[in-house]
């Protein structure tokens, strides 16, 4: 299946249903009063993480998704049916971004996690809502509000504990093949790896970690050279970066310069990513004697001014690979993954349409109080008075709806 890690889609929440203007008409009840019901709320749009998906290919061609509109209110105080929600399944590790405002709406990092990305419109009010002691036959209603509509950018970022960095042909794919059951393509030409891949490294019966291999970086990647830096986002959730260095490049380049280039490209992409723990691992020591390899690595670290620990391995033969994996596992255990979101106490959500109905009711009440004495005529005695009115209605508007 083709690996797709970005997709732009259009999502539209359902509009709210309109309120209804209606009056009760039954035998022997000629003036039954208002009985127009409210409309239904529009359907919402959700994203839900699914661990059985590993690509956004389902959204490559199907680009528009719309929730159902709420039904209009009806007579006999019947409320319109709420619009049906739609739930879009996405792979675990998907980030949702508003493409117009560039606002990050959230990350889905756990199976079954659900996120609201478009809120449906609020329902309109029927004329029953406007009944009062001075407005016995209201003919007012409100319309449903429109649902949210937005262009949503979906970005898939792999969830891995360890990320691999390095120039093309540094041996990243060979390393993953050596330590896991993953079988990425390996060949003697640059950019053999075209898409990211994951491998699970089992250190012992009870400990394992996930390593991510991305296509190699070259100088100018931040400006689009090679495959660019689009795949670096897959390393943002890694806890440690393994910078694999070829100590004997076939093109004769200086390994120290190659390390500096990767550091520069990493910083240009994200300062936060460049500050992650990064280990230098010198590969292909099987191409020379141990003494020569140690001498060359010493020269490289002196040129870089590298004062931290480093490793010498041969991914092809497996030399010194197990100790490296054990050290990685110890680091992961000692540095648990940071929570993606802080656990905060839930707050009462105030939706943008909450005051809309209050303002409409207050406006109509004010108009009725002003115009009641001036516009009243004897003919109004034949209007639809509310026969079931009681003293409880004398308190003003009967506001039943609570959002």
Curated annotation (Swiss-Prot):
Residues 160-333 form the OBG-type G domain. Residues 1-159 form the Obg domain. This is GTPase Obg. The gene is obg. GO terms for biological process: ribosome biogenesis. It holds the Pfam family MMR_HSR1. GO terms for molecular function: GTP binding; GTPase activity; magnesium ion binding. It is an enzyme of class 3 (hydrolase). NCBIfam families: Obg_CgtA, PRK12297.1, PRK12299.1. It is found in: Cytoplasm. Monomer. One of its GO terms (cellular component) is cytoplasm. It comes from Haemophilus influenzae (strain PittEE). GTP binds at residues 166-173, 191-195, 213-216, 283-286, 314-316. InterPro entries: G_OBG (IPR031167), GTP-bd (IPR006073), GTP-bd_Obg/CgtA (IPR014100), GTP1-OBG_CS (IPR006074), GTP1_OBG_dom (IPR006169), GTP1_OBG_dom_sf (IPR036726), OBG_GTPase (IPR045086), P-loop_NTPase (IPR027417). Mg(2+) binds at residues 173, 193. Belongs to the TRAFAC class OBG-HflX-like GTPase superfamily. OBG GTPase family. PROSITE patterns: G_OBG, GTP1_OBG, OBG. Keywords: Cytoplasm, GTP-binding, Hydrolase, Magnesium, Metal-binding, Nucleotide-binding. Its cofactor is Mg(2+).
